[in-house]
């Protein structure tokens, strides 16, 4: 209590702390460091080793030193090594993990959803256009025009940055683009001629043509298990074709031609493998395919369009809806193809193959619901068998490719 009374009565600044010492033998003087000027250490020897405790704190001689000199008398602080992540976190500089890196499964699911959604919307809107504007060559051309404009705008803003192209690469991409253009036109002729569900059922035969081309054109052995899985596809398409109410030879033949064209596109794509990213490759293919598709559109449909094609469509739905439908269907066509490519880059081939089969199921199912297409029982069974066969084929092929990659790794 006497100490506290002394502190309360005479503590005015640091000098008041000197009265709080016991009468004891003086401690040895603390020598000032050599780098400090004389007289900077004040009363260091006047405070004994057993300094008094005031309010739970022990007085130290350092309290009597100027604040600027305190660090020089303090012991060096040890720095412990920490892992980079822990060190950054302790300093408040930890890099925040973005949503895309934190939830990759959700992002992949979003890609699949957009792929299905855009594909279904494209097929439905495309068929609605053909119901009042039956000119598939011109509509196919519009698909590519909108896609090319989209690519040019993307290049202009650097999303993505345009990859340079030379004559050698142009020669490699031209056959791919030619097959892409032919397959695109014939697919649309088929979509315009028959029900969307039936056209996609016929297009389920594409793996059969791909296997045949691999075996007999490229000379590569196709495993027997793959051929066996294609049998349900052929049987299912045959059953569906025999009883399809919207069947006509124009739609059937053009769907088969598109299968062959896309098969050759795959073959030429393997020969034209480049280091260019998929977005730029698809952009260049779209530009070349657009040039390829202009002549047949002008030859087969140009005169009819100028005579009554445009005027009839505008009279039915109006100019605004006609133009907006063409723009949207072209945009959906380009985006769903681009998203499909981006999805393939994010997942394993097996996952993509299964997703592609499910996409066809979604398109067939939604087209039947939206357009109210009547299908016979045999057509429904045949379509189901064909889709199941494609799923089996895709699974076996992806497994074989995966085993090849593991062996080569």
Swiss-Prot record:
Site entry: May be essential for binding and transport of phosphoenolpyruvate: 225
One BP annotation, GO: monocarboxylic acid transport
A GO molecular-function annotation: organophosphate ester transmembrane transporter activity
InterPro entries: Sugar_P_trans_dom, Tpt_PEP_transl, TPT_transporter
Function: Mediates the export of fixed carbons from the chloroplasts into the cytosol in the form of triose phosphates. In addition, it can also bind and transport phosphoenolpyruvate, thereby increasing the photosynthetic efficiency of C4-plants.
Assembly information from the UniProt record: Homodimer.
Listed name of the protein: Triose phosphate/phosphate translocator, chloroplastic
